[in-house]
């Protein structure tokens, strides 16, 4: 299950923030989290899954579909007939509608097209409120979403701080090439800001050599 939820808070998660986890869900379970999956039947239509047995479709569903650019025609489709990307979008809509205490996206970005990933990322950054945990080993994806980062290694927490501080730390993880470049440059007194945006990096380099 790529979207789960928890009704139990935990001291390592900052309330009402988006926390990235570089590790896996077992690390969180071993840290005291209880997770629940979303129950559904493959034979249900999307409308049945999101709207229950009500005849009239809830306006909140229509509004979220519009904001995420999801075709209303999907409401008539059965869950089993959705593509993987479409199903992830529908699960995300379900989570928005049901407002769980803590939502967990477990490698939600895996296999997700750039188009769908961008829609979800933009919605989370602009609209989502509440506590969200994003589990992934893609540091660029985590950086695009998260305020805080937790790094697990062998079941132990190696880092739990504001996201950008990971780049200044000595924690050994697989950094994206752009971060490796900035770290190398800063070791030679370049004083560049950490970013995963190539355009922002070029601007910073230009400012530093003026």
Where are the regions a protein language model picked out?
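Conserved beta-strand-loop-alpha-helix hinge in the C-terminal portion
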Residues: 156-179, 183
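Conserved catalytic segment of ABC-fold P-loop ATPases
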Residues: 144-151
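ABC ATPase nucleotide-binding domain signature region
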Residues: 13-59
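A short, surface-exposed alpha-helical micro-motif characterized by mixed small hydrophobic
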Residues: 113, 142-144
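Conserved ABC nucleotide-binding domain
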Residues: 64-80
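H-loop/switch region of ABC-family ATPase nucleotide-binding domains
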Residues: 135-137
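Walker B catalytic motif
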Residues: 104-109, 113
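Hydrophobic anchor residue at the start of the ABC signature
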Residues: 91-93, 120
């Amino acid at each position: 299950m790529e979207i789960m939820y928890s009704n139990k808070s935990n001291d390592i998660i900052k309330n009402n923030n988006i926390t990235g986890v570089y590790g896996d869900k077992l690390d969180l379970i071993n840290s005291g989290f209880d997770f629940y999956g979303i129950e559904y039947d493959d034979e249900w239509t999307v409308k049945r899954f999101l709207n229950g047995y009500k005849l009239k479709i809830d306006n909140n569903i229509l509004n979220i579909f519009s904001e995420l650019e999801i075709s209303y025609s999907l409401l008539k489709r059965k869950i089993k007939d959705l593509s993987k990307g479409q199903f992830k979008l529908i699960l995300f809509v379900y989570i928005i509608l049901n407002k769980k205490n803590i939502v967990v996206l477990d490698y939600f970005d895996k296999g997700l097209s750039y188009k769908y990933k961008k829609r979800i990322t933009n919605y989370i950054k602009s609209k989502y409120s509440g506590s969200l945990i994003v589990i992934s080993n893609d540091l660029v994806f985590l950086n695009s979403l998260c305020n805080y980062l937790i790094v697990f290694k062998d079941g132990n927490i190696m880092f739990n701080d504001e996201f950008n501080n990971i780049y200044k730390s000595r924690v050994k993880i697989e950094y994206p090439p752009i971060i490796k470049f900035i770290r190398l440059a800063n070791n030679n007194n370049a004083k560049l800001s950490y970013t995963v945006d190539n355009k922002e990096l070029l601007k910073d380099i230009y400012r530093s050599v003026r």
